[in-house]
């Protein structure tokens, strides 16, 4: 959520920055709401002053034996009380309308984010590794994976399209990847591992910005009868739960940064993605991801963003996978981000790079929603900055390992860094 004081003091500048990311901020609507709010507040202050003045007169009138005049004054105070209640209701209505609108407004892009309308105008930062030149006809991960235990028909039979069953060697490789990622982040990068719920309420999703904007992208569950019926949601990413662990908190500054990680399934309806990536693991309703979250001092957040990109890169390097880093342009950034880097891994069968990690700085956008603060060196409570990044998407990493490390006979070479997690197995072979 944007800072309302910033909106009030720099409305035109905020509107201009939002326009850079393709959001049309309705300044006329905002000005009208502000006028209504100010009008009600002025009326409230006038009523309160009048009530206080008349209340003082009542005692004096009674002391002078002027009971009829005192009664008239008491009737006036009673009417003022009614008027104040109405003014409070009017102010509450204006504030609720303003708050609901603020929840739908995206974050402001950082000044150094490249301007662009969509993903075609993202900017490549660097490429790492050289895509392998194969001397045989390559297969995609579906054809490679099915003989090794990747079962798309089984997933569809159980749950419908975009679900997958894994068994045997593939299931073990999938688990090994997640464990390797977690160990790297906890043992080498200093994150604390978490296990968090997979089902959350709407307040939690509002805190990280998924609600109310992206309700159609979420899976929800309903429980209880008619009177006690409640709706909750399956998490689209562990960013939601990890970040919300500090909701409502005041963190001593010496405890920052907080570095959190978790391996979890993620559930997404993929609304608007009909017909895209219908083959294979690239786009699933349920997929696993190892998430990184950092809660930091505001002055450290952009330094931390670069650090988190490096943490994700370390996984790709260890797995010997070619990749590139790109800066998302203003028109392609996520709702809550001020700046985002995507890491894209080389997918040989598609002859292109595909997203495998997204690392974002949200500055105080999420913290303001969650009321997540820290106490600075002067004892003042200030909003923290929050960052999140994939470290990595496990299914897409599996795709990359299968395709980049395939052999002509359909076997898969296991990267050396991953072999200890596979019981020393150096190659997956069709049995």
Swiss-Prot record:
Enzyme class, UniProt record, top EC level: ligase
Entry-linked PANTHER family: SERINE--TRNA LIGASE, SERYL-TRNA SYNTHETASE
Subcellular localization, as worded in the UniProt entry: Cytoplasm
Family annotation (Pfam families): Seryl_tRNA_N (PF02403), tRNA-synt_2b (PF00587)
Protein name: Serine--tRNA ligase
HAMAP family named among the record's database cross-references: Ser_tRNA_synth_type1
Residues that hold ATP according to the record: 268-270, 355-358
Main location class: cytoplasm
